[in-house]
Swiss-Prot record:
This is N-acetyl-gamma-glutamyl-phosphate reductase. It comes from Pseudomonas entomophila (strain L48). Its EC number is 1.2.1.38. Pathway: Amino-acid biosynthesis; L-arginine biosynthesis; N(2)-acetyl-L-ornithine from L-glutamate: step 3/4. Catalyzes the NADPH-dependent reduction of N-acetyl-5-glutamyl phosphate to yield N-acetyl-L-glutamate 5-semialdehyde.
Length: 344
């Protein structure tokens, strides 16, 4: 069994990680930490996990205890993994970080977007960006994995086939994305209150969202050149889900885009290219580690529209983290992740 530690188990990504690992046949959660909830039983905080983690209680983070684990997940706000990851890596423990701490390869760029100096720039050379559909082989050999964000996952998977094939104009990319309220986290905030978010929808961070440099970094690598991306996120009155509507222009309108996408993702267990003309729904991926994609070329012109949907807490966070765990430890990539989307 893989001995697992979790730092920061009280947020939405933390409890989703617990839910997924409870059904994983090769992983056992041995340590879970929370400074604010130390001493509280996991089953008392999350009744849905009763019978799965009996006897497991939250504890104050301790590097020695965490260092005895085979792998430690960080489901924490940015900056926390900076302080602990180095010590764990020195102890031989693998680190899978769900926060943004090691996603950007440029420490100065990270500091610009997150409002503080990068706390562990020396570790960036060891960090592997954990998008399996791009970096599977690097993940197998990794010590430190940076799990992609939710918007970046849906957006990159939607644009990748076009950019890798050199079909899309990389200077004219648009990502119009919608997120459920759980993407804002579990902390109390006026904008996340039911009376504020219910029956309403709004754009936010149009001037610049923290996920913009992460998305641009990935698309730049796919295109092999700089990209021009306009990214506009929106908050919608649902709990889970990301719906990304992506726009790109192509010079060659004779290419069979459906075939291109189907070929690119033919061997990817968690990317579902839907039949031509489809419109994927966020509810179809609720609770599932799946990205569903449909590609359109309206009126047969040079504008391509890609629709990409994920569950922000699963393929956009904790499910992708478990997918990385499976790859890292040489397991079947689908282990513990075979859940169908929850309907209705």
């Amino acid at each position: 069994m893989i001995k697992v530690g979790i730092v920061g188990g009280t947020g939405y990504t933390g409890v989703e990680l617990l839910r997924l690992l409870a059904q994983h046949p090769q992983a056992e959660v041995a340590v879970i930490t929370s400074r604010s909830e130390a001493g509280v039983a996991v089953a008392d905080m999350y009744p849905n996990l009763r019978g799965h983690y009996d006897g497991l209680t939250f504890s104050v983070p301790d590097s020695k205890t965490l260092g005895a684990c085979d792998v430690v997940f960080f489901a924490t706000p940015h900056g926390v993994a900076h302080a602990l990851a180095g010590e764990l890596l020195a102890a031989g423990t693998k680190v899978i970080d769900l926060s943004a701490d090691f996603r950007l390869q440029d420490a100065a760029e990270w500091g610009k977007w997150y409002g503080q100096p990068h706390g562990a720039p020396e570790l960036l050379k060891d960090a592997v960006y954990g998008l399996p559909e791009v970096n599977r082989e690097k993940i197998r050999q990794a010590r430190l994995i940076a799990v992609p964000g939710c918007y970046p996952t849906a957006t990159q998977l939607g644009f990748l086939p076009l950019l890798e094939a050199g079909l899309a104009d990389p200077a004219r990319l648009i990502a119009d994305c919608k997120s459920g309220v759980s993407g804002a986290g579990r902390g109390a905030a006026v904008g996340s209150l039911f009376c504020e978010a219910g029956e309403s929808m709004k754009a936010y961070a149009v001037k610049g969202h923290r996920h913009l440099p992460e998305i641009s970094q990935g698309l730049r690598l796919a295109a092999g050149k700089d990209v021009g991306l306009t990214f506009v996120p929106h908050l919608t009155p649902m709990i889970r889900g990301i719906h990304a509507t992506l726009y790109a222009t192509v010079a060659d309108t004779s290419v069979d885009l459906q075939a291109l996408f189907e070929k690119r993702y033919a061997n990817e267990p968690f990317v579902d290219v839907m039949p031509a003309g489809s419109h994927p729904e966020t509810r179809s991926v609720r609770g599932a580690n799946v990205c569903r994609i449909a590609v359109h070329r309206p009126q047969g012109g040079d504008l391509v529209v890609v629709l990409s949907v994920i569950d922000n807490l699963v393929k956009g966070a904790s499910g992708q983290a478990v997918q990385n765990l499976n790859i890292l430890f040489g397991l079947d990539e689908r282990m513990g992740l075979a859940h169908a989307g929850l309907l209705p």
